[in-house]
Amino acid sequence: MNTTLAQQIANEGGVEAWMVAQQHKSLLRFLTCGSVDDGKSTLIGRLLHDTRQIYEDQLSSLHNDSKRHGTQGEKLDLALLVDGLQAEREQGITIDVAYRYFSTEKRKFIIADTPGHEQYTRNMATGASTCDLAILLIDARKGVLDQTRRHSFISTLLGIKHLVVAINKMDLVGFSEETFARIREDYLTFAGQLPGNRDIRFVPLSALEGDNVATQSASMPWYNGPTLLEVLETVEIQRVVDTQPMRFPVQYVNRPNLDFRGYAGTLASGSVKVGQRIKVLPSGVESNVARIVTFDGDLQEAHAGEAITLVLKDEIDISRGDLLLDAGENLPAVQSAAVDVVWMAEQPLSAGQSYDIKIAGKKTRARVDAIRHQVDINNLTQREVESLPLNGIGLVELTFDEPLVLDTYQQNPVTGGLIIIDRLSNVTVGAGLVREPIEHTAATPSGFSDFELELNALIRRHFPHWGARDLLGGK
């Protein structure tokens, strides 16, 4: 057993008391991102090592692996703690998203180590989708690169409010304050173009040597800020979903016998209470919450993030993908939306193509009506394009086969985030973030929609023998 963990359990008075203490710690989900070979995996290995989260047998195995696959000469290659795939170890790079867990006395952490190569940008977007904070690594020798900008923009797009810019490998530039200041200024110039307000912090460090990771560096007396670990332990995270209205996407209908019908899922935002009047969309039918059932027993109130089963007072028709919300809220269904898309397939995305869409447990189809623009990652400018290439990011108009109830992604990542699936191969080819639901075209003053008027004009022009009258009252 890890000696530090054993000591913590002993101090808490046993395993059960230690587990209770762990449950009451706050949880921070963060990812490491940046360009290839910036030291992301090494940084995570250093965090695990310096917080004493490595078991003795893991440390022994790491020594042996460092001799066979290591890239640091005689030194311990901490990146091997995270790079688990054989291909990753052979190439000395990260390919898949690797998740690691560790804790300190102040907080629990889940880390997503994401790949830096451009062809694995889709993996990075996957890792970032559930995180509250992003550590953006920059090699002190190279400065701000294209992937630095790309990952910054994707993190911002996915609603991550906290960015920690870790300027790594300071030992290779002589721990130069001038180098740190120059990179900091370059990044702030770029970050000024990112949408929204961001909490951006800068930490100069050496993941290989441990400077300013968990302990203050003696080699950089000019830096008097917190270490990286101190930033992670103290940053205040405010979850948007806690302050948003109730959203409960139905994941499945739970009907174990004739006496019970419940609607299971995870509460995406807000809270729900027993007795609360709720509305089912898209049908609009209303009812009251009779019970809130969980594995550990019934609740009187549930909050965002909890997996629950709702039992309603009335027997009404509810299916997987329906959305439950407070009865007093009016959320119209829409059939089109402007969606920010991160494209993940070799075949480009073009207007006119159709795909399967999954959003909040519901599966439907959508057609690409138009690509409004693609974002140039280097300067965040928008340019008109005919198609969106692999790893391209752009704003796309989608029309769905049926009306959907949507929030914007910034309001609610669950009801505003979708995945795009190829209908033939069933492969996920894109990630979408709803920027703006587009409401149906309003009826004209005549009472007819634009579509009906256009169809009427077409029939009268090409089929006059049908004798169709002009809906606007003309001849």
Swiss-Prot record:
Keyword Cell membrane belongs to the record: no
Q: Which GO terms describe its molecular function?
A: ATP binding; GTP binding; GTPase activity; sulfate adenylyltransferase (ATP) activity
Q: Give the residue ranges for region: G2.
A: 92-96
List the EC numbers from the record: 2.7.7.4
One Pfam family it belongs to: GTP-eEF1A_C
Region (G1) residue spans: 34-41
Assigned keywords, A-Z: ATP-binding, GTP-binding, Nucleotide-binding, Nucleotidyltransferase, Transferase
- Which parts of the sequence belong to the tr-type G domain? 25-239
InterPro entries documented for this protein: CysN_GTP-bd, CysN_II, CysN_NoDQ_III, G_TR_CS, GTP-eEF1A_C, P-loop_NTPase, Small_GTP-bd, SO4_adenylTrfase_lsu
Q: Which reaction does it catalyse?
A: sulfate + ATP + H(+) = adenosine 5'-phosphosulfate + diphosphate
Q: Which domain of life is it from?
A: Bacteria
Pathway, per Swiss-Prot/TrEMBL? Sulfur metabolism; hydrogen sulfide biosynthesis; sulfite from sulfate: step 1/3
Assembly, in brief, is: Heterodimer composed of CysD, the smaller subunit, and CysN.
Functional description taken from the UniProt entry: With CysD forms the ATP sulfurylase (ATPS) that catalyzes the adenylation of sulfate producing adenosine 5'-phosphosulfate (APS) and diphosphate, the first enzymatic step in sulfur assimilation pathway. APS synthesis involves the formation of a high-energy phosphoric-sulfuric acid anhydride bond driven by GTP hydrolysis by CysN coupled to ATP hydrolysis by CysD.
What family does this chain come from, according to its entry? Answer: Belongs to the TRAFAC class translation factor GTPase superfamily. Classic translation factor GTPase family. CysN/NodQ subfamily.
Name of this protein: Sulfate adenylyltransferase subunit 1
Recorded source organism is Citrobacter koseri (strain ATCC BAA-895 / CDC 4225-83 / SGSC4696)
Gene encoding the protein: cysN
